Every structure is written in C-alpha cells, then in structure tokens.
Amino acid sequence: MTAKRLTKEDIRNAPILNPVDHVVLAFDNDEVTSQAVDALRATGFADQDILAYSAAEATPRLQERVRAASGAAGFGYEIVLMRRYLSYAEQGAGWMIVYAPDDAAVQRIVDVAKRFNAKCAVRYHRLANEDLI
C-alpha cells in the first residue's frame, strides 16, 4: 500500500516527521538544493513530488520538533534523525522531501543525492527509516 503524496501543509501540521514513501534530503545550502531540485525534475519527478525548504524555513520547525519531543522519543531513532536534521539546518543546509512510492523513484533520488553530495538521504517506510547514503 502506497502512502499519499504529502504537501507542505501536511508536513507543517504533522506532530512528528514521518513522511512514509518519501525521502528526506539535506544539501550544503539552498543553492545546491535548488540545483538538485532541477536535476530531479529532469529525471521525471513532477513539481508536486518535490517539497523544497530553505534553511531559514526548516530551522525553526526542526527546533520546535526537537524541543517538543517526548521523553520516550528521546531514545528512539526519530529523535536522532531530528537532531541530525537540526544540526544540518543550523549550518545552513537546504532541504527536500521527495515522494518516492517505489524503488525506481528511490534510485533516481539516490543518484541525484550522490551527484550533489547530499548530507543525508533518509527513506521513510511505515515501520522503519532507511539511510540511503
């Protein structure tokens, strides 16, 4: 069963970041992120498949998510990822959340992530997350 393609509104309103059937990527800065977005479009991804975020846009939300994490979440992989993402955001990283409902889409994302030296690429499954690079 494939999860639905998320919007920025979905992400903003979600209490936790768990975008099933999506890949979260961070790049050195907003300019590199923009170049990676163009490269993904060139491989066949549609505009609605790609949610791009600037560091300025992502940092406050990540700070809030880390701050609001419950004590139990502090020991899970979810909070480890949030802290990693926050660290990258505070260093000026640009972000993407890309809809990837199948392995072929994921491979195209990984190829672009490697070409643009992504800091991270994490695929979200229903019950687990997968570091892709």
Where are these regions (language model features)?
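Positively charged, small/polar-rich N-terminal and surface patches that mediate targeting and assembly
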Residues: 1-133
